[in-house]
Design a protein with these regions (language model features):
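Basic, flexible Lys/Arg- and Gly-enriched helix-loop patches that mediate nucleic-acid binding at interfaces
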Residues: 1-215
Length: 215
């Protein structure tokens, strides 16, 4: 479309797809008609275990987009990620600027997880999680780690992260010799998963959208 000369910016034909412009500030037209900016969408999904988090639909793998099969909302992308074996709160949006603010490791919101582990961590192990462990040349720490409930052979922990490194919780627990049985993200900042059913999604409220970027 662009290379065919059908797109103009500020009354000038543009043929380079990577031509820099700010969509909100330029007069963009396609075939002489004003380009309508898509409505911004902000969603939360209760991701089921076993689905791959990816930025596009793939026929060869079972991805999170399966949960949106019955909807017609246009392009959206995950904001952050959960690995295939993890479940819980996953955000989606078609607003890349908002997504970048949410996922900024320096200023983005904290993330809270409920984690079932094989074995019973003692106070010293919980302290190590907060103090940090070394793994693959990285120091991995939790903002907080506390016991939720204890069974005969396993326990549920609540772990809060201030930054999201790849498989961070699994790596911390592996370094302390605990096997992760389940890992569920229950909140991001002040936005909680609540009673949203597994595999279901809903729109974020305006207050939730603002809260996730500190507005």
């Amino acid at each position: 479309m662009i290379r065919e000369g059908r797109v103009s910016i500020a009354s000038r034909i543009v043929r380079e797809p990577e031509h820099p412009t700010l969509e909100t500030e330029a007069d963009i037209r396609v075939d002489g008609q004003h380009f309508a900016k898509p409505v911004s969408r902000y969603l939360m999904l209760n991701k089921p275990r076993g689905l791959v988090t990816t930025t596009h639909v793939e026929r060869s793998r079972d991805t999170v987009y399966r949960c949106f099969d019955d909807s017609d909302m246009g392009w959206i992308a995950p904001v952050g990620r959960l690995d295939k074996a993890s479940e819980g709160l996953l955000l989606f949006s078609n607003d890349p600027q908002w997504a970048a603010r949410v996922t900024d490791p320096a200023t983005g919101p904290s993330k809270t997880y409920h984690v079932q582990v094989c074995g019973i961590p003692d106070d010293a192990a919980l302290h190590r999680m907060r103090q940090g462990v070394q793994d693959q040349g990285e120091r991995l720490t939790a903002v907080s780690a506390r016991m939720l409930r204890v069974g005969e052979r396993n326990a549920w922990l609540e772990i809060v992260l201030g930054e999201g490194r790849n498989r961070q919780i699994r790596r911390i627990l592996q370094a302390l010799d605990f096997e992760v049985l389940r890992l569920v993200r229950v909140s991001i900042g002040r936005v909680a998963l609540g009673e949203l059913a597994k595999g279901a999604w809903r729109e974020l409220s305006a207050d939730e959208v603002a809260a996730l970027v500190g507005d």
